[in-house]
């Protein structure tokens, strides 16, 4: 039997978040109008702009508070992200900002997902870094993949797979991650970035070393950054956490903005 009190509490919280999102949407109308006026003056030039469509904050694990970080040694990590705005090209940012040793990325791909860690193989594209298939992220740094022509729609989902050959769990270097991702992501042994289905994978609701994704389009968009506590991640009461539901504050806000033109 469902716990009605929990459901009502969750619905009330979601309704409050939606009210806040509508207020923020009204506040963004002015920048959108100014942007439209500027575009009218130079519409014959058809410029293109990069803007961040997805991003998350990273941290290191807090002993005794955060759950243990999964073992990462010779590991493929497959992570699903929910975009806000779409575009014709993408670039993906990877981070080693809290690490104390270089992070070797020995393969990375982007694709559309089919759920439960599976991907649409026909959509898979390799990511390159200065035209190379691998890269090293220095301690305290971030790197972006080369721009890739990969059209994406507003509010769509993408799957990013990376292969990390090193023994990160066996080193003393902190792992840069976002603990409360509330998205089922997958860690599998060996190099499986191009596999449609992962073998022997374990799951986590965290994001690892993945910092942001930018899109390139002809729209000059303002970017809104949501800063706050775990409510921004979509945290609810423990027995009703919305994993894989995209029920974060910024998801509600993006829905309102893009569905209202």
Task: Put a short name on every predicted segment.
Residues 252-261:
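Signal peptide-proximal N-terminal region
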Residues 29, 36-227, 232-242, 246, ...:
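N-terminal secretory targeting modules
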Residues 23-32:
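Bacterial N-terminal signal peptides
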Residues 4-24:
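Bacterial N-terminal signal peptides that target proteins for export
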Residues 5, 19, 35-41:
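Intrinsically disordered, low-complexity serine/threonine-rich segments
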């Amino acid at each position: 039997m469902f716990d009605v009190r929990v459901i009502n509490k969750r619905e009330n919280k979601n309704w409050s978040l939606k009210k806040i999102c509508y207020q923020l949407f009204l506040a963004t109308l002015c920048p959108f109008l100014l942007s439209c006026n500027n575009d009218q003056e130079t519409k014959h030039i058809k410029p293109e702009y990069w803007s961040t469509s997805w991003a998350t904050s990273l941290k290191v694990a807090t002993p005794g508070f955060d759950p243990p970080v999964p073992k990462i040694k010779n590991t493929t990590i497959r992570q699903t992200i929910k975009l806000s705005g779409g575009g014709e090209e993408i670039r993906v940012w990877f981070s080693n900002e809290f690490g104390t040793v270089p992070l070797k990325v020995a393969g990375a791909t982007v694709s559309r997902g089919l759920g439960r860690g599976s991907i649409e193989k026909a959509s898979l594209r390799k990511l390159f870094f200065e035209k190379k298939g691998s890269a090293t992220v220095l301690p305290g740094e971030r790197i972006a993949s080369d721009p890739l022509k990969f059209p994406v729609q507003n509010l769509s989902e993408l799957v990013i797979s990376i292969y990390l050959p090193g023994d990160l769990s066996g080193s003393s270097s902190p792992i840069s991650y976002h603990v409360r991702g509330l998205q089922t992501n997958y860690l599998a042994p060996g190099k499986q970035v191009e596999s449609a289905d992962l073998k022997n994978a374990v799951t986590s609701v965290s994001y690892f070393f993945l910092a942001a994704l930018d899109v390139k389009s002809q729209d000059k968009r303002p970017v809104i950054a949501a800063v706050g506590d775990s409510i921004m991640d979509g945290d609810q009461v423990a027995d009703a956490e919305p994993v894989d539901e995209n029920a974060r504050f910024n998801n509600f806000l993006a829905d309102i903005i893009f569905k209202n033109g």
